[in-house]
């Protein structure tokens, strides 16, 4: 299990509400799902997870391989984020922005959960998509949970990725759990779990490599992982039209 007390800007909460209202979306069921995303929120926190299948090939030009990736927004500031979409198709960053490595989720052996193929000189579409096998959402005053699993690594690695993210509002604490369900455990596989941060966040790792302290404006959060060491790497935030910023 990985624990995070974490803080969080793709949409500010009010902007996101207006966006949903403009599109005519109204939550009418307990799944809290819109367009393949589970969205849980209160006045301070918003938790968003990608729990939808990849689109069919003809509608996948803008798809990014982010199955079970999630974002956290706290008081209108995004902490945990995906890295954004680079719109200039002639730039190699466009292809890069589609990869699973740029989403806040798990990847295996540096592969994305989807395969892509060329539609024309510059456009890529999904060749082999990803299917969400199961998903579940719990939204109560003092307990939230979004969970799901996908088959994006089933063919290559005979592996199902399962993820759940819990939130305890009274404690302002997130708890996450990732599991690789494998049909054949005889061969070790390398996996990475990435959490991309707001480029304005300041981070510091503790000496035991088990915790990271995150400062974002007037909020401070602590990310813990007891089972594995945590590394801080430099990355790119592409959520700026045809531009980017460095993040971690």
Residue ranges of model-derived segments:
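Carbohydrate-active enzyme catalytic cores, enriched for enzymes
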Residues: 1-81
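CBM-like, beta-strand-rich accessory domains located in the C-terminal region of large
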Residues: 1, 5-8, 85-248
């Amino acid at each position: 299990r990985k624990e995070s007390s974490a803080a969080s800007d793709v949409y500010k909460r009010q902007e996101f509400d207006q966006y949903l209202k403009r599109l005519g979306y109204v939550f009418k069921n307990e799944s809290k799902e819109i367009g393949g995303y589970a969205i849980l929120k209160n006045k301070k926190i918003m938790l968003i997870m990608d729990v939808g299948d990849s689109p069919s090939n003809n509608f996948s030009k803008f798809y990014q391989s982010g199955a079970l990736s999630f974002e956290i927004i706290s008081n209108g500031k995004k902490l945990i984020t995906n890295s954004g979409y680079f719109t200039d198709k002639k730039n190699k960053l466009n292809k890069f922005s589609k990869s699973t490595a740029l989403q806040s989720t798990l990847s295996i052996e540096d592969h994305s959960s989807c395969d892509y193929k060329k539609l024309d000189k510059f456009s890529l579409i999904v060749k082999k998509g990803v299917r969400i096998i199961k998903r579940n959402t719990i939204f109560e005053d003092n307990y939230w949970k979004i969970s799901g699993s996908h088959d994006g690594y089933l063919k290559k690695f005979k592996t199902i990725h399962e993820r759940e993210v819990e939130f305890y509002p009274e404690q302002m604490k997130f708890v996450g759990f990732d599991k690789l369900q494998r049909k054949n455990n005889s061969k070790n596989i390398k996996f990475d779990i990435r959490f991309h941060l707001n480029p304005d966040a300041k981070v510091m790792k503790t000496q035991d490599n088990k915790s990271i302290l995150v400062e974002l404006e007037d909020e401070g959060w602590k990310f813990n992982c007891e089972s594995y060491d945590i590394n801080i790497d430099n990355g790119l935030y592409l959520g700026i039209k045809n531009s980017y910023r460095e993040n971690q």
